[in-house]
């Protein structure tokens, strides 16, 4: 084996730059990627994601987001089983690069400050602290409160 080959094998290369900004800060607010976790059933952990690309967090409101997601659920065939749920709540599940909750379905913390007001057509999404790569849960609030009282999983 020649010395050049040995040198390459023994050297560790990093494929990232510590000075590079986090992806949550690198994309503009008008060109963000957010994930919506559509929750059909809490006990059975029935969740399906919608990934919204190039979403405008600077101009869109929680009401706009709610309507956009409901429209996708109604028009995409893969969401047919989710159409019988009366969705009425959007809540931040996790912020980009933040720690995730122990519960795989929903974040039980921050009910007051991470729940979005879907009736407010003035407050923009970025004003809720939503940025690129934020995950948001969509669910029925009554089902959530019932599951929060007794978080028993059935599968």
From Swiss-Prot:
It comes from the Eukaryota. Its main location: cytoplasm. Transmembrane segments: none annotated. Keywords: Cytoplasm, Phosphoprotein. It is found in: Cytoplasm. The modification Phosphoserine is found at residue 78. One of its GO terms (cellular component) is cytoplasm. Pfam families: DUF2340 (PF10209). Belongs to the UPF0538 family. May be involved in mitochondrial organization and biogenesis. Present with 1230 molecules/cell in log phase SD medium. This is Altered inheritance rate of mitochondria protein 29. It comes from Saccharomyces cerevisiae (strain ATCC 204508 / S288c). The gene is AIM29.
């Amino acid at each position: 084996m020649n010395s050049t080959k040995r040198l390459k094998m023994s050297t560790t290369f990093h494929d990232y730059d510590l000075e590079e900004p986090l992806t949550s800060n690198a994309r503009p607010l008008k060109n963000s990627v957010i994930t919506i976790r559509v929750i059909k059933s809490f006990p059975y952990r029935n969740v399906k994601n919608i990934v919204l690309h190039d979403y405008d967090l600077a101009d869109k409101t929680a009401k706009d987001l709610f309507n956009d997601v409901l429209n996708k659920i109604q028009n995409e065939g893969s969401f047919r089983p989710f159409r019988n749920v009366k969705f009425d709540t959007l809540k931040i599940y996790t912020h980009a690069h933040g720690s995730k909750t122990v519960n795989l379905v929903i974040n039980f913390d921050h009910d007051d400050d991470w729940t979005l007001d879907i009736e407010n057509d003035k407050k923009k999404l970025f004003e809720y602290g939503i940025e690129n790569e934020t995950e948001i849960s969509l669910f029925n609030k009554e089902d959530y409160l019932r599951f929060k009282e007794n978080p028993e999983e059935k599968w």
